[in-house]
Amino acid sequence: MASTISAYKEKMKELSVLSLICSCFYSQPHPNTVYQYGDMEVKQLDKRASGQSFEVILKSPSDLSPESPMLSSPPKRKDTSLEELQKRLEAAEERRKTQEAQVLKQLAERREHEREVLHKALEENNNFSRLAEEKLNYKMELSKEIREAHLAALRERLREKELHAAEVRRNKEQREEMSG
């Protein structure tokens, strides 16, 4: 029992309180574990619904040799002169102007395209209106001609009936004169 308590105290010293609490609630190992196989490291990344993903890190040949020195510090940047700074500023200004000109050109092209689309839409609308008006006029003319033809046919029948009635009256008068 005493050895268990001393081992527990050693463990408490090694782990932070947060790790201890997490290990109590979550007993499985951390998902981002690193496995080493010879000259490469395999790091497990997030698990996805489509499967698992891994990151493979290969050690460089310089890391493999034991006598190789540690990575050297990066080379120090030399002080830039005022002329170099001026050149960089001018180049940046030129890039900014070029980018601004390109944006303005794209805006102009977009406006021109919008004008063309609007003009085409107006033209199509005018053509549609003109065709609809022509079609309506044609239908009105056709109905007017049909109406006039119908009225002419009615007048012709009425005239024929009047002629027939006049002939019947004449025949009747002739019969009356002959009979009486």
Curated annotation (Swiss-Prot):
Protein name as annotated: Stathmin-3
Role: Exhibits microtubule-destabilizing activity, which is antagonized by STAT3.
Subunit structure and binding partners: Interacts with STAT3. Interacts with CLU (secreted form); this interaction may act as an important modulator during neuronal differentiation.
Pfam family, one: Stathmin
Source organism (scientific name): Bos taurus
Keywords: Cell projection, Coiled coil, Cytoplasm, Golgi apparatus, Lipoprotein, Palmitate, Phosphoprotein
Domain SLD: from-to ranges: 38-180
Record PTM text: N-terminal palmitoylation promotes specific anchoring to the cytosolic leaflet of Golgi membranes and subsequent vesicular trafficking along dendrites and axons. Neuronal Stathmins are substrates for palmitoyltransferases ZDHHC3, ZDHHC7 and ZDHHC15.
Primary location: Golgi
Lipidation (S-palmitoyl cysteine): 22, 24
Region (Disordered): 58-82
GO CC, one annotated term: neuron projection
PROSITE patterns: STATHMIN_1, STATHMIN_2, STATHMIN_3
An MF annotation (GO) of this entry: tubulin binding
One BP term from GO: microtubule depolymerization
Positions with biased composition (Low complexity): 60-74
Location in the cell: Golgi apparatus; Cell projection, Growth cone; Cell projection, Axon; Cytoplasm, Cytosol
